[in-house]
Swiss-Prot record:
InterPro entries for the chain: EutC, EutC_C, EutC_N
Cofactor(s), by name: adenosylcob(III)alamin
Pathways involved: Amine and polyamine degradation; ethanolamine degradation
Compartments, as annotated in UniProt: Bacterial microcompartment
Keywords: Bacterial microcompartment, Cobalamin, Cobalt, Lyase
Chain's role: Catalyzes the deamination of various vicinal amino-alcohols to oxo compounds. Allows this organism to utilize ethanolamine as the sole source of nitrogen and carbon in the presence of external vitamin B12.
Subunit structure: The basic unit is a heterodimer which dimerizes to form tetramers. The heterotetramers trimerize; 6 large subunits form a core ring with 6 small subunits projecting outwards.
Protein name: Ethanolamine ammonia-lyase small subunit
Lyase recorded as keyword: yes
């Protein structure tokens, strides 16, 4: 088959496909549409301001009211939806935003202005920076000789109670709760004729650092208020670790813990009153942790 025959065959096929119409058609030149860009001044809504307890993304749920009632009972991410095999964009963005807040809380420091405002006694463990704090938890439990002298010089020897504040794994937890919980503890202790004076602030703090403080000060009870590891629900959760005459290397069972102290958990004012009661009971029974009945 030569070129001429091939050309005739193609023309025949095209004629059959067009229903026998052989009139030439001229394709219209495409026209360019003009899209006008409108720039408006405004702000992008903050996705973290959405209350996920009230947000239901499931389309046409069988029991909408029951679903929302269940969501009020937990901060878990229930009632999400998907686009094919993946979560919707809004859900993914909220997840990443909450994760970023948690990361920021771990790697940031408690404001020095807050430490000065609260008249804390600032000390530092043997950790030099956040990286060392995260990779060497053993150094976050110990103080060097210089810090030991600072603690000794600014606290009352053999006091009934020594309050300690530590940044821990969440600076946001301290900044969000400390101003409310300390007055509540002090007020609650007045009922038992108890009080505390200078408060130690520990930078790069691990929980067992309270044990060395207990040995340095000789206090009957040491109460450590520390920022807990943040999660996707909140970065502002604080805990109180309380022990009667803590010593270095003591078993963890000797600590009494009140956790989940934040606005969405146990309110700091309520927690402060309970902490005061626990401190009184420890002094009365001379024990703490699982030994405190």
């Amino acid at each position: 088959m030569n070129e001429q025959e091939l050309k005739q065959m193609i023309e025949g096929i095209l004629t059959e496909m067009s229903g026998g119409k052989t009139t030439d058609t001229v394709a219209a030149a495409p026209t360019k549409s003009v899209v006008e860009t409108v720039i408006t001044e405004g702000s992008i809504p903050d996705i973290t301001e959405v209350d996920i307890k009230k947000q239901l993304l499931v389309p046409e749920p069988a029991d909408r009211e029951g679903y929302l009632k269940m969501k009020q009972m937990t901060p878990a991410r229930l009632g999400l939806w998907r686009a094919g095999p993946r979560y919707k964009t809004e859900t993914i963005l909220r997840f990443r935003a909450d994760h970023a807040v948690a990361q920021d809380s771990v790697f940031s420091y408690v404001s020095e202005d807050l430490v000065k405002e609260m008249n804390f006694i600032p000390v530092n463990t043997k950790c030099q920076d956040k990286d060392e704090y995260l990779t060497r938890p053993d150094l976050g439990r110990e103080f060097d000789n210089e810090m030991v002298e600072v603690i000794r010089a600014n606290t009352t020897k053999n006091a009934k109670l020594q309050i300690v504040v530590g940044d821990g794994l969440s600076s946001a937890a301290i900044e969000a709760n400390i101003k409310d919980i300390l007055p509540s503890i002090k007020q609650g202790l007045k009922m038992y004729n108890l009080d505390f004076d200078n408060i130690i602030f520990v930078k790069h703090c691990r929980v067992p650092s309270m044990d060395q403080i207990g040995e340095i000060t000789g206090a009957d009870v040491v109460c450590l208020l520390v920022g807990e590891r943040p999660g996707l629900v909140t970065a502002e959760s604080m805990s109180a670790y309380i022990a009667y005459k803590p010593t270095i290397g003591m078993p963890e069972a000797r600590r009494t813990v009140i956790s989940n102290i934040h606005s969405g958990g146990t309110p700091p004012v309520e927690a402060g009153a309970y902490i005061a009661e626990l401190i009184h009971n420890m002094l009365e029974k001379k024990c703490s942790g699982i030994d405190l009945k």
